[in-house]
Amino acid sequence: MKLMIFTGLVLFAIVSLIEAQAENEKPCLPEYKVCTHAPGNCCSDLVCDRYGRYKSGAQIGRNCFCLQKGVIYKREN
């Protein structure tokens, strides 16, 4: 009986540890994915860059994307 209780407790501890570890290892956001609400979730070789959206000179919002570090994006006409 004691062995069954001990085994149950050990299994419970292992399952709890696995669930906690899986929760901490959230998948990272790949390149060009929106990171507005999760700026720290971009993959390690990427950075969350923020861009303001403007209409008639007034800012109407922000967009954030996971982009390569050190790369400068320019608008093409």
Swiss-Prot record:
InterPro entries: Spider_toxin_CSTX_knottin (IPR019553). GO terms for cellular component: extracellular region. Expressed by the venom gland. Residues 1-20 form the signal peptide. Pfam families: Toxin_35. It is found in: Secreted. The keyword Transmembrane helix does not apply. GO terms for molecular function: toxin activity. Keywords: Disulfide bond, Secreted, Signal, Toxin. Contains 4 disulfide bonds. Its main location: secreted. Residues 21-26 form a propeptide. Belongs to the neurotoxin 19 (CSTX) family. 08 (U8-Lctx) subfamily. This is U8-lycotoxin-Ls1n. It comes from Lycosa singoriensis. The lineage of its organism: Eukaryota, Metazoa, Ecdysozoa, Arthropoda, Chelicerata.
